[in-house]
Amino acid sequence: MSDINTTCLPAWLATCPCTGDDVNPTLTCGESLC
C-alpha cells in the first residue's frame, strides 16, 4: 500500500491541488487515480 501511495502522490497532486479545507475531495481524487 505504501508503494502505491508513493506512486500516486505526484499523480494526483498534479491533477488535484490540495487546499487545507479540501482534504476530503483531494483524498477522493487520489483514490480515483489509484
Curated annotation (Swiss-Prot):
There is a cross-link at residues 12-16 (2'-cysteinyl-6'-hydroxytryptophan sulfoxide (Trp-Cys)). Residues 1-10, 18-34 form a propeptide. Processed by the macrocyclase-peptidase enzyme POPB to yield a toxic cyclic heptapeptide. POPB first removes 10 residues from the N-terminus. Conformational trapping of the remaining peptide forces the enzyme to release this intermediate rather than proceed to macrocyclization. The enzyme rebinds the remaining peptide in a different conformation and catalyzes macrocyclization of the N-terminal 7 residues. The keyword Transport does not apply. There is a cross-link at residues 11-17 (Cyclopeptide (Ala-Pro)). The keyword DNA damage does not apply. InterPro entries: Amanitin/phalloidin (IPR027582). Belongs to the MSDIN fungal toxin family. Toxin that belongs to the bicyclic heptapeptides called phallotoxins. Although structurally related to amatoxins, phallotoxins have a different mode of action, which is the stabilization of F-actin. Phallotoxins are poisonous when administered parenterally, but not orally because of poor absorption. This is Phalloidin proprotein. It comes from Amanita phalloides.
